[in-house]
């Protein structure tokens, strides 16, 4: 009877972990995108208020006419762009625009790029921290930091405070993403369950990206700047409170085993291949988001609604792929194959961007990019947890910090190289280069088909176990240690050796 109640409690715990990680990723990525339609107009208005005088008749209560002539492409193009890149786009594409808009574009680029930069710096510290203190304390801290960031966004009226809010969000986002992925890998030991759980959690990520910009624009237009951020702050309070109430009794745990050092994981070729797949597919998205809007304006005089709708299939197809491919890749133990197919599809699709000329082509191609990226992420993320199970100590914070660093590198490097390359060789050549890189890298995923096992002795409950092809499941709820054999990637593990 006790064992049945224990299993029920463990199943309930898994569902609660999944709900909390879903909320965490949804919140972080909705805050990532909700500022996109708000910041340009708000910064322009504040700059105009600062430079206007009472006698010049400037009306600072409404958006100046010039702000309405700036399409969403400037926002999208500056999402991860460098300041010099945004300045070039401003001068070449909108020569008739007000000169102050160039300054606004630089500020927007700095603001939106600061999160990925801070997250890139913080991730190597968050990963080992979660391995040392567990996942729940960083998760709780992440919710608290996001509450602080949303509050700063709501009440900030200067560029410096907005930059501080965006940087704080990077710290909170790092805590949420690293600890969230680690929690899922820790409680979902079965391959199929883990893949399905991570696919559902990625749905929260995609929904946040889809809902963020429309929600922000509507709330900003009809309620004001503070409203969307206060709503997100309330969601953060609810998510953090739910997490605290559920997992507070679990703080009294048995001694936590020491995770594998960061440098050791970075020397693992399989983990590097998996992280590279995530990085290069992210590089595709970051580069396209930066350069496609301006290319559409130059070649087809795209309108505002066209520049906004062209990226919608990206997130929608990412949402679909993350649920479908995560289940298929784990059900048939073919994560490496789906990752290889996803990268190859992303490469071919990226090259096709340079040969397209209508909005319908771009919509279809963005749908393929979203599906390809979702396929790679939903296949590789669970795989990184398996690699730690197979080759290292099964503590997951550091390995998912590496995965998050790979995402941040893609979003930081993509826009930086996009501007100079487009200026020198053009948009079609840039797409061909990025696509070819993905096509060349895709075959490396084949090496993930049968990674070698790496036995590592660990002391648990006073007994030394040599991990070869065996999972040892640590359940913090019951403080019990279950040992079972789980075949992965078509391999049958030999019996465990007890010392």
Give the role of each language-model region:
Residues 144-157, 344-357:
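C-terminal ends and interior cores of transmembrane alpha-helices
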Residues 122-134, 321-334, 422:
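Helix-to-loop junctions at the C-terminal end of transmembrane segments
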Residues 121-156:
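Conserved MFS/SLC helix-loop-helix module at the cytosolic interface between two early adjacent transmembrane helices
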Residues 2-12, 249-275, 462-479, 483-488:
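Juxtamembrane intracellular "pre-TM" segments in multi-pass secondary transporters
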Residues 134, 155-160, 189, 301, ...:
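Helix-breaking motifs and short loop linkers at transmembrane-helix boundaries and internal kinks
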Residues 165-204:
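Cytoplasmic helix-loop-helix junction between adjacent transmembrane helices
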Residues 35-37, 271-312:
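Extracytoplasmic gate region of multi-pass secondary transporters
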Residues 201-247:
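Helix-loop-helix hairpin linking two adjacent transmembrane segments in secondary transporters
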């Amino acid at each position: 009877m006790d064992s049945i109640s224990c299993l029920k409690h463990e199943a309930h715990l898994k569902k609660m972990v999944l709900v909390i990680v879903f909320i965490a990723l949804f919140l972080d990525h909705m805050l990532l995108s909700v500022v996109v339609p708000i910041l340009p107009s708000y910064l322009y208005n504040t700059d105009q208020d600062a430079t206007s005088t009472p006698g010049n008749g400037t009306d600072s209560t409404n958006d100046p006419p010039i702000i309405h002539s700036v399409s969403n492409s400037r926002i999208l193009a500056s999402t991860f762009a460098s300041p010099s890149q945004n300045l070039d786009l401003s001068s070449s594409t909108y020569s008739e625009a007000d000169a102050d808009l160039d300054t606004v574009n630089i500020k927007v680029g700095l603001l939106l790029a600061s999160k990925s930069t801070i997250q890139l710096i913080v991730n190597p510290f968050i990963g080992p921290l979660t391995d040392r203190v567990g996942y729940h304390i960083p998760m709780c801290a992440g919710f608290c930091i996001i509450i602080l960031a949303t509050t700063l966004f709501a009440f900030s009226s200067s560029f410096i405070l907005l930059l501080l809010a965006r940087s704080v969000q990077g710290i909170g986002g790092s805590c949420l993403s690293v600890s969230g992925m680690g929690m899922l890998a820790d409680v979902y030991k079965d391959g199929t369950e883990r893949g399905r759980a991570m696919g559902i959690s990625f749905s929260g990520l995609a929904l946040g990206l889809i809902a963020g910009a429309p929600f922000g624009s509507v709330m900003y237009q009809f309620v004001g700047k503070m409203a969307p951020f206060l709503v997100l702050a309330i969601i953060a309070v609810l998510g953090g409170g739910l997490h605290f109430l559920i997992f507070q009794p679990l703080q009294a745990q048995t001694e936590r085993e020491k995770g594998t050092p960061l440098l050791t994981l970075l020397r693992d070729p399989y983990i590097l291949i998996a992280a590279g797949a995530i990085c290069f597919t992210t590089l595709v998205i970051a580069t396209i988001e930066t350069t496609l809007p301006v290319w559409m304006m130059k070649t087809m005089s795209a309108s505002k609604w066209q520049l906004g709708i062209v990226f919608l299939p990206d997130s929608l197809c990412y949402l679909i792929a993350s649920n479908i491919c995560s289940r298929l890749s784990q059900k048939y133990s073919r994560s490496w194959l789906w990752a290889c197919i996803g990268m190859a599809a992303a490469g071919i699709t990226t090259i096709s961007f340079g040969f397209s000329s209508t909005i319908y082509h771009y919509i279809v191609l963005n749908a393929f990019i979203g599906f390809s990226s979702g396929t790679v992420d939903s296949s590789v993320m669970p795989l990184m947890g398996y690699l730690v199970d197979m080759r290292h100590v099964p503590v997951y914070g550091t390995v998912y910090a590496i995965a998050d660093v790979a995402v941040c590198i893609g979003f930081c490097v993509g826009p930086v190289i996009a501007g100079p390359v487009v200026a020198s060789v053009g948009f079609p050549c840039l797409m061909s280069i990025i696509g070819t890189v993905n096509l060349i890298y895709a075959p490396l995923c084949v090496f993930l088909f049968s990674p070698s096992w790496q036995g590592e002795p660990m002391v648990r409950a006073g007994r030394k176990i040599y991990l070869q092809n065996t999972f040892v499941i640590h359940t913090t709820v019951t403080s019990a240690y279950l040992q079972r054999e789980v075949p992965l990637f078509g391999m049958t593990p030999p019996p465990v050796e007890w010392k």
